[in-house]
């Protein structure tokens, strides 16, 4: 009688590994492209900046619609909104802190974050 050796299923194949638990590197990440939607709403209300929706869900939908690559003009409207709420030291500090918190929550161990100081020239930080 012969026996058949079954494949070892105890160790997962590389495709079965849960990527969420692996350490990550984030290269060329834009600070003004990673704001939390709720933060955009909070900061816009505090600063009197007009937003295209008044709920987190509505604004998230607007952002997704404009960031889908349909047109550069629509895409850049998102950045016009996010940079509009990054015009004070306090706003910038909150955005940067939350950005790093989100990277950590995603398992990022090294991040290269980019931002455009010239976009903050509305009030000369």
List each language-model region with its residue ranges:
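Metal-cofactor-binding active-site regions of metalloenzymes
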Residues: 2-123
């Amino acid at each position: 009688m012969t026996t058949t050796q079954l494949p070892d299923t105890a160790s997962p194949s590389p495709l079965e590994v849960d990527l969420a638990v692996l350490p990550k590197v984030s290269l060329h990440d834009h600070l003004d492209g990673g704001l939390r939607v709720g933060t955009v709403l909070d900061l816009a209300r505090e600063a009197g900046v007009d937003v295209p929706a008044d709920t987190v869900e509505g604004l998230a939908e607007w952002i997704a619609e404009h960031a889908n690559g349909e047109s550069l003009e629509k895409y850049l409207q998102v950045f016009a909104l996010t940079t509009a709420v990054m015009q004070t030291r306090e706003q910038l500090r909150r955005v940067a802190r939350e950005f790093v918190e989100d990277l950590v929550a995603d398992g990022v161990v090294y991040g290269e974050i980019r931002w455009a100081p010239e976009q903050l020239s509305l009030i000369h930080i």
